[in-house]
């Protein structure tokens, strides 16, 4: 008797969930992390096909594609603030081994894409919409022409904010979207947001828009103790990222500009108006319990406004969920893949 995959999809997903849940780790375990990374992840990253395209203003955007065959489902990754595609080698390998092609682009002013400030260490944009326009350009010029199977979105931090704006216009192209610690509200620390916005508005008004925002710009990765990392509890993964800044200094970002802070805050304020445009899309939001960079309240509000949204708070996690210690990271990857697998059939 021939079985229909579609009719028996739930059983298959159940079996898959048991298999995923039984795994103790994914591509790389923290134990002897660097050796495993060099043996497993580095060769995989070498297999990526790199390319570049021009943004709407002629700025160069770099991207990388991990593709095995036309019929596979695919994941578009939108990276976080100050990140490059190099940060996502481990995650890309996990997705590849789970059966997905991966497309990842460096945001303008970050990674290997063109810089917009006089100082290449400054994350700067004239307006937030350029991030969204770049993502749409990447989607239409690179991703959609190649993908023949279902397409999914995985967006982290600032990429989550860009992703929400992308979905406003392009939700029809995606089966589901997973957000990791999305920047739906900037954490301005002890300074109230309205006051922080007032300060950067003043800086922009006096012609300092492309300069470091107050209190930013003094980040030195050589002085960070991996055991005291504020982005992840994983000493091994923190050390790897810090070493990456030294090995590939052109990807290093020391801080955001005044204009960047202004644009991001304004973009978060417009989020409630966007939700209705992708309200029916299956959404997963992974929330870090101890996030020092974004506030979780707006993540919960966005999820509550969506029809099919699951919010998972991961205990004992800092902002970089996909760079966390194995137990938390494995839980995050299981949740992401469960979402993607469940919606492959449409």
What are the language-model segments listed below?
Residues 15-54, 61-64:
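An N-terminal hydrophobic leader/cap segment in hydrolases
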Residues 72, 80-83, 158:
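Active-site glycine-rich loops that stabilize anionic/oxyanionic intermediates
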Residues 92-118:
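Conserved alpha/beta-hydrolase
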Residues 123-143:
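Alpha/beta-hydrolase active-site loop
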Residues 162-252:
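Alpha/beta-hydrolase-fold enzymes
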Residues 279, 285-287, 291:
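Short beta-strand/loop motif that positions the catalytic acidic residue
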Residues 281, 295-304:
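Short alpha-helix in the alpha/beta-hydrolase fold that links the catalytic acid
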Residues 310, 315-346:
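Catalytic active-site module of serine/aspartate enzymes centered on a nucleophile-bearing elbow/loop
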């Amino acid at each position: 008797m021939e079985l229909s995959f579609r009719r028996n999809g739930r059983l298959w997903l159940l079996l898959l969930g048991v298999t995923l849940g039984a795994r103790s780790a994914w591509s790389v375990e923290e134990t002897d992390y660097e050796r495993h990374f060099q043996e497993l992840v580095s060769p995989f990253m070498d297999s990526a096909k790199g390319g570049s395209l021009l943004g709407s203003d002629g700025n160069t955007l770099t991207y990388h594609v991990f593709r095995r065959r036309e019929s596979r489902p695919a994941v578009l990754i939108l990276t976080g603030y100050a990140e490059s595609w190099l940060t996502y080698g481990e995650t890309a390998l996990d997705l590849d081994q789970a059966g997905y092609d991966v497309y990842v682009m460096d945001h303008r002013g970050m990674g290997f894409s063109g810089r917009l400030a006089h100082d290449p260490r400054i994350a700067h944009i004239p307006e937030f919409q350029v991030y969204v326009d770049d993502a749409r350009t990447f989607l239409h010029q690179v991703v959609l022409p190649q993908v023949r199977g279902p397409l999914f979105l995985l967006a982290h931090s600032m990429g989550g904010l860009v992703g929400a704006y992308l979905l406003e216009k392009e939700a029809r192209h995606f089966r589901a979207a997973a957000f990791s610690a999305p920047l739906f509200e900037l954490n301005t620390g002890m300074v109230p947001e309205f006051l922080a916005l007032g300060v950067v508005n003043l800086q922009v008004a006096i012609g300092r828009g492309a300069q470091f925002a107050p209190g930013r710009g003094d980040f030195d990765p050589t002085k960070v103790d991996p055991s005291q990392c504020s982005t992840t509890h994983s000493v091994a993964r923190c050390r790897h990222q810090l070493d990456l800044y030294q090995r590939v200094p052109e990807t290093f970002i020391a801080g955001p500009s005044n204009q960047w802070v202004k644009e991001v805050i304004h973009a978060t304020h417009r989020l409630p108006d966007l939700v209705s445009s992708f309200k029916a899309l299956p959404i997963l939001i992974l929330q870090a319990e101890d996030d020092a960079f974004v506030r979780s309240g707006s993540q919960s509000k966005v999820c509550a406004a969506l029809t099919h949204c699951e919010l998972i708070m991961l205990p004992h996690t800092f902002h970089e969920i996909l760079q966390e210690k194995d137990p938390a990271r494995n839980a995050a990857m299981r949740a992401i893949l469960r979402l993607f697998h469940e919606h492959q059939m449409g």
